[in-house]
C-alpha cells in the first residue's frame, strides 16, 4: 500500500487532472451511449414501429392543427409527386431491408426485394376479381391473418374499405399503394411501396394462386408496416385481424360449454351483419382430417345464415333452428348428415320457405345443419360484431340492425393509475373508472334486460415486440351504482371493500383484447379495467356495445381548486400548520435580500436549502467535474495528498479491478471507507459513493424559479417580503401534507397517494393530469420525492391561477392568444 501511495503522491495534481479529464470523457461516453440508446431507439421506434398510427391521417378527418410531422405520408401527394418526376416510390419509413423483415435475428439467407413487374409478367392488382383463393400462406407464421383476409373477401363493402379498388399496375402506376386498417378507435391509411421480399425470384410470404396477382401480398406488407416488421405478425388470433379490418368487437364461445341463449346470440349477430365463423379442433390422435360426416378438422367455416325454418310433418308442425355454413374450399367437402343437400328432411319444408332462404343443392361447399347438430359437431364459434359505421345505408334500409357503441381511451401509469386487480384492494380503486347508463331494455327481451358487450383492448403491444414487450394480463370488473354512489368521483377504497361485482371478464389473460357479454337490468354501472398486477404500464381502449343506447362517461374528478369539504384521507392525522415567526422571518429575509429588499431564485434556494435540509436528499457536488467534489478515505490523514486520488481511482477503476490484488490495496471492498462530502458537511454529512446517482443538492433551480414565478406578479424575477411570506406559508402547508403521507419517513410518497395528498392541499385532479405528473415527476418505482412534490403543487397552482384569471364567466373556459399563452406559461 505504501508503494501505491508513493506512486500516487508522485503523480500528484497531474494525475488528478488526467484522471478528471478521463472521468469526464468516460462519463460523456457513458451518458452519450445512454442517450443514444434511448433516443435513437426511440426515433427508430417512432419511424418503424408505429409509422401509420403516428403519421397517417385518420380517415375522414383533417390532420392535426399543430401541423404535420415531418414523416407524414399522404397518398395523393406522394403519388402525384412520383408521377410528375417519373420515379417509383421508395418508402423511407419501411425500407427494403432486413430491419423490416425481422427484429430478433438476421435472415439466414439473402433476401431480394423486387417489384411485381420484376417477379411476373403483366402484374395485376386483381385477376378476375378477388376471392379466398387469392390468399395463400408463405413462410411466415401468420395463418391468423390469412384466415381473416379470406373472410374479408366475403363482404365486398368491408373489403373495399380496407383495400381501395382504384389501384393498379397500369394507370397512374408509381410503385405506391395504400391500405386502411382500424387501429384503436381510428381508421388509418398505411402507405407502402411495392417492393416485396423474394427468394430465388419467388414471393416468400402471402401470395395468390395466380402468380401475377399481388393485392394479397401488398396487403400483408401494409399490415407488417403497421406493426413494425413482418416478424411482428408471427402468431396471433383471427379475431385480432378481423377487428383491424372492420373496427368490430370479437367474441368467441366454446360450444361444449355454450350458453343457453347462444342461438339467439347468433340470430341477433346475423341481423347486425356480424361476421361469424366456426371450427373443429384438430385431434393429434386422428390421422384423417375429415370426419365421417364430411367435416374438416382444424378448418374454418363461415356462417352465412341463422334462422328459424318452418317445418310440416305428419306428426309435427313448427319451427326448427337452423344454421347455414360454407366451406371456403368451395367444393364437395360438405356435411353429409341430416339437412345436407341430399337429405330427405327437406321434403317437409314448404316451397315458399325454400325460396325465401335461397335453398340450393349445388356442390359449392355450402350446406345447412340443425343447431343441435352444430353444437354436437363443432367446437368453437367466433363472432365479429361490426361497429355502427360498418353497415352501409342500403344494409340499414334492408332491415339490418346496428349496435350502439361507446368508447374511451385510457392509461395505466405505475404508481398512479396502475392499481392491479381486485386482489390488491388498497390500490385497485386507483385504476381508471367508467360509468355506463343503460336506459331501455332490449326489444323483445321478456325479462326487460339489456345486452351489453364490454371489450378491453391494450394498445400497441404487438408493434413493440421488437423491444421485448408482450401483452399484459388484463381484465375488468363491473359494479352496480345507486344514485348516492353516483356522486362519488371516483369511487374510493371503501366502495370496493364492501361492494361485490355484478359481472367481470371471464379471465385475466395476456391477449390483446378481453371481451365478455352480459345481460343487465337498466341502471348505472361502474366498469374498472385493470392489469392483473399493480404497477404495470400500458395504454388501452374500452368499448361498450349494446342493443339499445348506452351513455358512457369517465368517473373521475374535475380539475380545479377544492372546497372546504376537502379533508385528509381517513386514517391519516391532520397536519399541524407551521406558522413561521414573523420577526425571525423578517430578519432572515433582510439578511438575504440585500439593498433591493427582494430575493431572486438563487437567494430563495439558499433559504430553502438551509431551512429544509432535513427534508431534502443529501447534497452531492462534484469537484473538478462540476462544482466541488471531494473524496475522503478514513485511513488517510488530513494532509495526505493521495487520499482524494485513492477515492477517485477507486471510483473510476473499481469495476475493472474487482477480484484483483489492487481491490484490497485500494480498500474498494470496504464501502465504509469511501465517502463523498459536500460544500457544507453540516448540511448532511458524508454519503457513500453509491448514492451519487440518486441524490441532488437541495431544491433544483427549476423548482426555485417556478416558486418565484408563482407569486411574481410584475415578472421581475424577484419577490418582496409579503410575497416571500406567502410563499413560505404555502411551502409550510405542502411540507406538512407531505409528511402526513410519507408514512415510512423516506422523503418520498407513493404515487398512488398523490391524488389524496394534492386533494389535501386543495387541488382536484383527474387521472389524465395525474398520469402526466407521474410520468414527469415519478421515479421508476412510482415514488415522488419531496422537492418533486413541491414542484407539482407549484405548477398546478400556477396553471390554475393563470386559467382562472381569464375564466371570468366561471364556465371553465378561458381565451388566450398564442402570444399570451406562451408569455404566461413559459415564465411559470
Curated annotation (Swiss-Prot):
Activated by millimolar concentrations of calcium, and by phosphatidylinositol 4,5-diphosphate, phosphatidylinositol 4-monophosphate, phosphatidylinositol and phosphatidic acid. Ca(2+) 2 binds at residues 742, 746, 748, 753. Residues 388-557 are annotated as: Domain III. The record marks 54-55 as: Cleavage. Localized to the anterior and posterior embryonic poles just after fertilization. Becomes distributed around the polar buds and just below the pole cells of the posterior pole during cleavage cycles. During these nuclear divisions anterior localization disappears. Localized to actin caps that underlie the plasma membrane, immediately above each nucleus at cleavage cycles 8 and 9. Localized to a small set of nerve, midgut and blood cells in adults. Residues 88-387 form the Calpain catalytic domain. CDD domains: Calpain_III (cd00214), CysPc (cd00044), EFh_PEF_CalpA_B (cd16196). Keywords: Autocatalytic cleavage, Calcium, Cytoplasm, Hydrolase, Metal-binding, Protease, Repeat, Thiol protease. One of its GO terms (biological process) is cuticle development. Its main location: cytoplasm. Residues 578-828 are annotated as: Domain IV. It comes from the Eukaryota. Ca(2+) 1 binds at residues 712, 714, 716, 718, 723. Its EC number is 3.4.22.-. Residues 558-577 are annotated as: Linker. It is found in: Cytoplasm. One of its GO terms (cellular component) is endoplasmic reticulum. InterPro entries: C2_III, Calpain_cysteine_protease, Calpain_domain_III, Calpain_III, Calpain_III_sf, EF-hand-dom_pair, EF_Hand_1_Ca_BS, EF_hand_dom. The active site is at 143, 299, 327. Belongs to the peptidase C2 family. Calcium-regulated non-lysosomal thiol-protease. Involved in the organization of the actin-related cytoskeleton during embryogenesis. This is Calpain-A. It comes from Drosophila melanogaster.
Amino acid at each position: 500500500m505504501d508503494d501505491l501511495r508513493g506512486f500516487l503522491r508522485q503523480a500528484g495534481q497531474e494525475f488528478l487532472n488526467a484522471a478528471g479529464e478521463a472521468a469526464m470523457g468516460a462519463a460523456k461516453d457513458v451518458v452519450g451511449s445512454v442517450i443514444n440508446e434511448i433516443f435513437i431507439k426511440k426515433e427508430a421506434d417512432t419511424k418503424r414501429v408505429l409509422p401509420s398510427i403516428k403519421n397517417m391521417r385518420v380517415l375522414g378527418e383533417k390532420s392535426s392543427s399543430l401541423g404535420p410531422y415531418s414523416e407524414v405520408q399522404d397518398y395523393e401527394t406522394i403519388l402525384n409527386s412520383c408521377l410528375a418526376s417519373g420515379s417509383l416510390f421508395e418508402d423511407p419509413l419501411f425500407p427494403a431491408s432486413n430491419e423490416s423483415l425481422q427484429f430478433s435475428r438476421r435472415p439466414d439467407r439473402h433476401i431480394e426485394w423486387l417489384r411485381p413487374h420484376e417477379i411476373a409478367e403483366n402484374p395485376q392488382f386483381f385477376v378476375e376479381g378477388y376471392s379466398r383463393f387469392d390468399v395463400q400462406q408463405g413462410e411466415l407464421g401468420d395463418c391468423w391473418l390469412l384466415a381473416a383476409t379470406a373472410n374479408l373477401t366475403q363482404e365486398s363493402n368491408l373489403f373495399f374499405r380496407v383495400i381501395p379498388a382504384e389501384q393498379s399496375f397500369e394507370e397512374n402506376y408509381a410503385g405506391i399503394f395504400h391500405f386502411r386498417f382500424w387501429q384503436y378507435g381510428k381508421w388509418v391509411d398505411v402507405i407502402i411501396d411495392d417492393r416485396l421480399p423474394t427468394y430465388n425470384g419467388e414471393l416468400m410470404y402471402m401470395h395468390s394462386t395466380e402468380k401475377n396477382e399481388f393485392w394479397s401480398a401488398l396487403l400483408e406488407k401494409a399490415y407488417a408496416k403497421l406493426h413494425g416488421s413482418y416478424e411482428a405478425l408471427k402468431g396471433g388470433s383471427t379475431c385480432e385481424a378481423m377487428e383491424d379490418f372492420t373496427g368490430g368487437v370479437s367474441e368467441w364461445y366454446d360450444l361444449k360449454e355454450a350458453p343457453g341463449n347462444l342461438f339467439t346470440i347468433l340470430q341477433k349477430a346475423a341481423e347486425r351483419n356480424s361476421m361469424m365463423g366456426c371450427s373443429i379442433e384438430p385431434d393429434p390422435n386422428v390421422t384423417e382430417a375429415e370426419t365421417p360426416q364430411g367435416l374438416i378438422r382444424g378448418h374454418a367455416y363461415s356462417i352465412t345464415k341463422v334462422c328459424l325454418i318452418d317445418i310440416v310433418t305428419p306428426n309435427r308442425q313448427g319451427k326448427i333452428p337452423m344454421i347455414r355454413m360454407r366451406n371456403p374450399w368451395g367444393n364437395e367437402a360438405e356435411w353429409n348428415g341430416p339437412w345436407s343437400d341430399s337429405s330427405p328432411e327437406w321434403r317437409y319444408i314448404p316451397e315458399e320457405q325454400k325460396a325465401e332462404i335461397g335453398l340450393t343443392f349445388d356442390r359449392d361447399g355450402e350446406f345447412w345443419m340443425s343447431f343441435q347438430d352444430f353444437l354436437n359437431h363443432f367446437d368453437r364459434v367466433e363472432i365479429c360484431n361490426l361497429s355502427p359505421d360498418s353497415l352501409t345505408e342500403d344494409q340499414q334500409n334492408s332491415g339490418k340492425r346496428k349496435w350502439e357503441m361507446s368508447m374511451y381511451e385510457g392509461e395505466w401509469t405505475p404508481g398512479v393509475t396502475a392499481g392491479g386487480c381486485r386482489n390488491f384492494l388498497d390500490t385497485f380503486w386507483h385504476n381508471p373508472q367508467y360509468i355506463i347508463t343503460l336506459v331501455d331494455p332490449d326489444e323483445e327481451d321478456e325479462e326487460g334486460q339489456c345486452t351489453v358487450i364490454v371489450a378491453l383492448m391494450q394498445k400497441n403491444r404487438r408493434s413493440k415486440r421488437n423491444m421485448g414487450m408482450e401483452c399484459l394480463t388484463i381484465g375488468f370488473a363491473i359494479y352496480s351504482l345507486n344514485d348516492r354512489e353516483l356522486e362519488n368521483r371516483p369511487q374510493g377504497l371503501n366502495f370496493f371493500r364492501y361492494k361485490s361485482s355484478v359481472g367481470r371478464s371471464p379471465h385475466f389473460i395476456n391477449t390483446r383484447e378481453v371481451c365478455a357479454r352480459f345481460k343487465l337490468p337498466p341502471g348505472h354501472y361502474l366498469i374498472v379495467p385493470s392489469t392483473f398486477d399493480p404497477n404495470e404500464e400500458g395504454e388501452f381502449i374500452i368499448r361498450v356495445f349494446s342493443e339499445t343506447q348506452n351513455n358512457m362517461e369517465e368517473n373521475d374528478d374535475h380539475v380545479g381548486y377544492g372546497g372546504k369539504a376537502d379533508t385528509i384521507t381517513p386514517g391519516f392525522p391532520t397536519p399541524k400548520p407551521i406558522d413561521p415567526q414573523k420577526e425571525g422571518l423578517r430578519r432572515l429575509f433582510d439578511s438575504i435580500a440585500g439593498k433591493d429588499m427582494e430575493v431572486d431564485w438563487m437567494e430563495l434556494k439558499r433559504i430553502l436549502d438551509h431551512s429544509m435540509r432535513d427534508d431534502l436528499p443529501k447534497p452531492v457536488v462534484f469537484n473538478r467535474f462540476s462544482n466541488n467534489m471531494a473524496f475522503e478515505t478514513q485511513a488517510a490523514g488530513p494532509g495526505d495528498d493521495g487520499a482524494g486520488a485513492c477515492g477517485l481511482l477507486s471510483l473510476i477503476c473499481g469495476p475493472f479491478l474487482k477480484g484483483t490484488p489492487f481491490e484490497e490495496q485500494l480498500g474498494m471492498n470496504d464501502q465504509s471507507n469511501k465517502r463523498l462530502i459536500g460544500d457544507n458537511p453540516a448540511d448532511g454529512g458524508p454519503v457513500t459513493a453509491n448514492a451519487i446517482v440518486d441524490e441532488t443538492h437541495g431544491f433544483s433551480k427549476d423548482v426555485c424559479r417556478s416558486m418565484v414565478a408563482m407569486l411574481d406578479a410584475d415578472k421581475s424575477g424577484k419577490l418582496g417580503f409579503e410575497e416571500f411570506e406567502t410563499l413560505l406559508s404555502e411551502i409550510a402547508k405542502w411540507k406538512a401534507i407531505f409528511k402526513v403521507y410519507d408514512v415510512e419517513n423516506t422523503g418520498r410518497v407513493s404515487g398512488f397517494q398523490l391524488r389524496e395528498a394534492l386533494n389535501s392541499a386543495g387541488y382536484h385532479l383527474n387521472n389524465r393530469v395525474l398520469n402526466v405528473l407521474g410520468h414527469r415527476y415519478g421515479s421508476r418505482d412510482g415514488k415522488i420525492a419531496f422537492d418533486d412534490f413541491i414542484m407539482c403543487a407549484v405548477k398546478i397552482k400556477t396553471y390554475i391561477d393563470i386559467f382562472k384569471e381569464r375564466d371570468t364567466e366561471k364556465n371553465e373556459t378561458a381565451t388566450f392568444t398564442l402570444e399570451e399563452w406562451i408569455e404566461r406559461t413559459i415564465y411559470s
